[in-house]
Amino acid sequence: MAEYTHTAAVTINAPANQVYHLFTHFNDFPKFMSYIKEVTYKDSQTSHWVADVVGSHEWDAVNENWIEHKQVGWRSTSGLTNHGVVTFEPVGDSQTKVNVSLSYDPPAGVLGDAGEKLGVGKAFEQKLQTDLDHFAQLVAQTPTGALDPESSNYLFHDDSAAAQGKTTTSQDSTMGDNA
């Protein structure tokens, strides 16, 4: 089975430290990403993920290669085999370029490889870019002073899994009345 890598990038109108802190609230991903249904923390270094990309897929991930305010990385330890890195590059004093690189082994063996070659991978990469753009829009639309990394309740996008009611019961319980 082959490993495939997909990338996306966006420049966000906020300083790198704020973007980094907001992005690393993984349990908020269902609020702005369309295919992430749940992210729950097992401890400070490991998390459980549920996604709906051509079917439902789950995995556990461990944090790797983190550099505060600059980079986050991960690799799966069970479930869907994947790993990746997200970098946060300051652009002047008030902007941040976010680069995402995600690599995975498609599930279903030869069928997964065939799907990747027939366009599933391209569609996934486009959705990854769209969701990253949603994150940038949400950060940009946040009122001045509301970019508090400890309070990200405003992070909802109309195309998100949360807004469409596609999150899991476990994820819903972490979002309280905001889902």
Label every PLM stretch briefly:
Residues T77-L132, Q137, Q141, A146-E150, ...:
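Beta-strand/loop substructures that line and gate deep hydrophobic ligand-binding cavities in soluble
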Residues V39, N63, V86-F88:
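A structural signal for short hydrophobic beta-strand segments in well-ordered beta-sheet cores
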Residues A16, S44, N65-H69, F88-K97:
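A short, structured loop/turn motif at beta-sheet edges
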Residues S47-D52, V72-S78:
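Short beta-strand segments that buttress and anchor functional surface loops
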Residues Q141-T168:
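Intrinsically disordered, low-complexity mixed-charge segments
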Residues M1-S44, S160-A179:
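Hydrophobic ligand-binding cavity/cleft-lining segments
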Residues T5-T7, H57-A61, T81-V85, K97:
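Short, surface-exposed coil-to-beta transition loops
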Residues V19-F23, F29, S47, N63, ...:
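Hydrophobic pocket/interface hotspot
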